[in-house]
């Protein structure tokens, strides 16, 4: 029978992992071990927050489950439903909003939101944690435009398809600015102060 040890990385509880994997204390150890690949696929399918799962025999009667989670980036409210936005672009219906990135103006644009989230999921946590909110604001000239409001007071204009790569330049550009302002990463990369006519 299985004494169960679970290694978690962020927000999933031991109970959530047991429920999603159908592995629990008292279950026959070798049955779990032989079905580990199927149980891993099942857990990932049931809960998109599980990115990967490893099941390891640690003794004659014990298992260890290691869970790698999809980072929870923030939340989006679309069509009166609240979604947890995950780093790989998946959306998971949720009842409570967290304090991560607020995704705004994505109503009716689930694919656009998923693409934007997957791009922001590429960012280093130091940059990602500096984002307060992201707003989808397409224009005639820039149909894939997102506007990112940073916690440090700057605003970033970007293309939702490339923002994950271009935001890597943000710390250097922001450090070189004398005043708070706009950093435009839609085409190329340049910045200007708020209220400046010189764009």
Segments from the language model and where they lie:
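Periplasmic polypeptide-binding modules associated with outer-membrane biogenesis and secretion
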Residues: 2-5, 30-79, 85
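Solvent-exposed coil/turn segments that connect beta secondary-structure elements
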Residues: 5-10, 58-60, 68-72, 87-90, ...
